[in-house]
Design a protein with these regions (language model features):
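Hydrophobic anchor at the beta1->P-loop junction of P-loop NTPases
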Residues: 9
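Walker A/P-loop
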Residues: 18
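NTP-dependent small-molecule kinase module
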Residues: 23-25, 142-214
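Post-Walker A helix-loop "phosphate-sensing" segment adjacent to the P-loop in P-loop NTPases
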Residues: 26-36
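ATP-dependent small-molecule kinase phosphotransfer cores
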Residues: 40-114
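A glycine- and Lys/Arg-enriched "phosphate-lid" helix/loop adjacent to the NTP-binding pocket
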Residues: 103-168
Length: 214
């Protein structure tokens, strides 16, 4: 392959995505795969300014303001696509913690189809594999509440909003054909499913060159 394999993991809050990422990384590295772990939030040099807009949006929901948030996030992903993803080894597997699929969960006014087009128009890198991590909303809400950092969400304030977020994300996942991992059992079970899907994608692409995907 002429570039890294790009895998994005997204989902609502509290679904165990970070723990799953760590477990997937460990299994792939044990199989002598070169794994690069990235985080959209930590890779985004403009996140501070964007979060100021998000905070305004939470206090005063407005379509134009949410659209501006979506545009800024898409601009950031374009920057990450150009300045971070292109710097990774060609023989690696990039696992990123959140990418544009997460907008399906957290943006409540602008339709996801419109958000997706914003990202496509900016040549944001399209993952070779979109992994949507989900649980029943009540399970992820309880998990998030039990964490040391709690829900740690700017945009969600109650279970009802979290249920809506979960339903919206699962609907987008079905519409877009993302690989859905229901993380309600053991971490080993979920890890095995995702690693198996990553290996299937690798095997499908192996043997012929894959160029830049846009």
């Amino acid at each position: 392959m002429t570039r890294p394999l790009f895998v994005a993991l997204d989902g609502p809050k509290g679904v165990g995505k970070t723990s799953l990422l760590e477990a997937i990384t460990e299994v792939l590295r044990a199989d002598n795969q070169k794994v690069i772990r990235l985080c959209e939030k930590k890779s985004d040099p403009f996140r501070g300014e964007t979060m100021q807009l998000v905070n305004r949006l939470v206090r005063h929901p407005d379509r134009n303001l949410e659209l501006e948030v979506c545009q800024r996030l898409a601009d950031s992903r374009r920057w990450i696509s150009q300045h971070v993803l292109t710097k990774q080894p060609a023989d690696s597997i990039i696992l990123i913690d959140r990418w544009y699929p997460s907008d399906a969960a957290f943006r409540r006014i602008v339709p996801f189809a419109e958000i997706l087009q914003l990202n496509i128009d900016r040549n944001v890198q399209v993952p070779d594999l979109h992994v949507g991590v989900v649980t029943a909303a009540e399970i992820s809400w309880a998990r998030a509440g039990a964490r040391r950092r709690g829900l740690s969400s700017t945009v969600l304030r109650g279970l009802e909003e979290h249920v809506a977020c979960t339903e919206a994300f699962e609907l987008a996942a079905a519409d877009q054909g993302w690989f859905l991992c229901r993380n309600e059992g053991t971490i080993e079970e979920a890890t095995g499913r995702v690693v198996g899907e990553i290996n299937r994608v690798v095997n499908r692409l192996r043997g012929h060159s894959i160029g830049p995907r846009r």
